Design a protein with these regions (language model features):
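A short beta-strand motif characteristic of beta-propeller blades
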Residues: 1, 35-41, 76-85, 126-138, ...
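Beta-rich, blade/repeat-based domains predominating
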Residues: 1-20, 24-26, 41-59, 64-66, ...
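Structural signal for beta-propeller blades
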Residues: 24-27, 65-67, 111-114, 163-164, ...
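Short loop/turn segments that connect beta-strands within beta-propeller blades
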Residues: 30-35, 71-75, 117-122, 167-171, ...
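Glycine- and Gly-Pro-enriched alpha-helical subdomains that act as flexible
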Residues: 95, 101-112, 116, 120
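Loop/turn-rich, solvent-exposed surfaces of beta-rich toroidal or solenoidal domains
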Residues: 110-112, 116-118, 127, 131-171
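Blade-level signature of beta-propeller repeat domains, shared across WD40, Kelch, NHL, RCC1
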Residues: 186-225
Length: 225
């Protein structure tokens, strides 16, 4: 039993990497076959995470206005920290583009989703506000939360007005209303052909078949015999 899990992503080693928030404040990895959990990082305040195909872990620390990075075999480092006038004020959801060259982060307390280019060593640069989210009214934040991308690079961001969709250039493609009066907070593609989009709202999970296909989870690296 592992309480306060908020973000989950398969790593190249086949384990599920997760944020464990609250008083735990750590990043953990679950080996489902062995039934074991390893603590990857402690004394952090994680919200959501992604893992690249070569083992870099990126996670949002909302309270710190920070994107953090754990390189393979390394320790936690601040990849980017926003100021009160620039960057995501409450970084929340996080996703990779299909080529894993760009990292995107939603801002629960603002109107934008921000992007960074990922360098060869895993560092982040060229931060920019790439997507403008719709809000319930001009004076309210978007409450941008969980997010994902599909196989052609479209962005899907949960928000106060529903699931917002954007093309790879950041242009609005449409909004799917929330299936319940509870806010939707997480989104991912799964199922046959990764053509079903799933959202979490409160204690319920909903799915909808789409014409798009999500990005397949990282495949475990094969071991040489």
């Amino acid at each position: 039993d592992a309480p306060r899990i908020s973000g989950m992503h398969f790593g190249p080693d086949g384990r599920i990497y997760s944020c464990q928030g609250g008083s735990f404040g750590r990043i953990v990895a679950f080996d489902l076959k062995a039934g074991e959990m390893e603590v990857i990082a402690e004394n952090v305040r994680p919200n959501d995470l992604v893992v690249t195909s070569d083992g870099h872990v990126y996670f949002t620390e909302t309270a710190k206005m920070q994107i953090s990075h754990i390189p393979p075999g390394g320790s936690v480092q601040a990849a980017d920290v926003a100021s009160k006038t620039d960057g995501p004020q409450r970084p929340n959801g996080i996703a990779l583009t299909p080529d894993q060259g760009t990292l995107a982060v939603s801002d629960y307390g603002g109107r934008h989703t921000w992007v960074w280019r990922i360098g060869k060593n895993g560092g982040l640069d060229l931060r920019q506000s790439y997507i403008t989210l719709r809000t319930p009214s001009p004076d309210l934040p978007s409450k941008g939360d969980g997010m994902t991308t599909d196989g052609v690079g479209r962005y899907y961001v949960t928000s106060a007005v529903g699931l917002q969709m954007f093309d790879p250039t950041g242009r609005m493609g449409g909004v799917i209303a929330a299936p319940t009066n509870k806010p939707i907070v997480s989104v991912t593609f799964a199922g046959p052909g990764h053509q079903y989009i799933y959202v979490a709202a409160g204690d319920e999970i909903f799915r909808r078949r789409t014409k798009a296909s999500g990005v397949e989870a990282v495949r475990p690296q094969s071991k040489s015999k």
